A protein has these predicted regions:
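Macrodomain-like recognition of ADP-ribose-binding/processing modules
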Residues: 1-269
Length: 269
């Protein structure tokens, strides 16, 4: 893709993002206000997260699937019970580069929902984060927002292609920046990553989630390895007594998808 085409597409996304943000603020004003009110902060100066106990004899592992889908498509495919999706968040900026035309997972969630309109009402969360960067490994911090309204590919504002789901907003350790600027070792990154994954699952458990939609957490510009992330999630799901019924890893059809399929199927044998 030429730079000109890239720039044109980014400018188009910027325009669409601003239009979507303004439209949501008008059409979904009451729903946004309620979601803002019900959003909880975990970690740091927020709520403590109870650690889920080790599995008891006879406990079951959730039904785990890997789908070559983006998060929103997976949500519309799997949403039945109480469902939450993991937002692979920017640690310091609500919505990441949503209004700047970026197109990573968080920005795509914002384009298809009321999420951005909720995140911007929690500046204290991001201010605290900006003061506690932990050499770019960041910290175990999350926002849990209830009843975010999602639209199927942003195509309509009316049923049946509209639903509500919870969103767990959490940043993965940024190994790319941590190793380059903070002299963080691979072992230090792995320790932070595994604890972050456990933290995410514990927050979801604390909110009684039935269906949890995850994915290649931190495997883009943050530099995490998809195989390691897949094994990390699988490890905690097997070892701890989580009560999720279904866990879906939504990973678009790339090398990351192949790694997730390989590691999850290998771990299941």
């Amino acid at each position: 893709m030429s730079y000109y085409n890239y720039y044109q597409k980014k400018e188009k996304r910027k325009s669409e993002a601003l239009e979507h943000f303004r439209k949501m603020d008008i059409l979904m004003k009451d729903e946004i206000r309620q979601s803002v009110k019900e959003t909880k902060t975990y970690g740091g100066n927020g709520l403590p997260v109870p650690h889920t106990e080790k599995k008891r004899p006879g406990s079951t592992v959730p039904n785990i699937t890997v789908e070559p889908l983006d998060t929103v498509s997976a949500l519309f495919l799997h949403q039945q019970r109480k469902t939450a999706v993991l937002n692979f968040a920017s640690y310091q900026n609500p919505g990441g580069g949503f209004l700047e035309g970026s197109s990573a997972q968080e920005e795509c969630l914002c384009h298809a929902s009321t999420l951005y309109n909720i995140l911007i009402h929690h500046p204290e969360f991001y201010t605290w984060n900006s003061r506690h960067k932990n050499n770019s490994l960041y910290t175990d911090r999350a926002l849990y927002s209830k009843n975010i309204i999602f639209f199927d590919n942003g195509a309509t504002l009316t049923p049946p292609r509209q639903l509500k789901a919870d969103v767990l907003t959490c940043a993965a350790p940024n190994y790319s920046a941590a190793s380059k600027y903070g002299s963080v070792s691979a072992d230090e990154n792995l320790t932070a990553l595994l604890e972050r994954i456990r933290f995410v699952l514990d927050v979801a458990e604390d909110n009684h989630v039935d269906t949890l939609i995850l994915g290649a957490f931190g495997c883009g510009v943050f530099g995490q390895d998809a195989a390691v992330v897949a094994c990390g999630f699988k490890r905690w799901l097997e070892q701890r007594d989580y009560r999720f019924k279904d866990v879906c890893f939504a990973v678009p059809d790339t090398e990351n998808y192949k790694k997730f399929r390989l590691m999850i199927s290998r771990e299941n044998k």
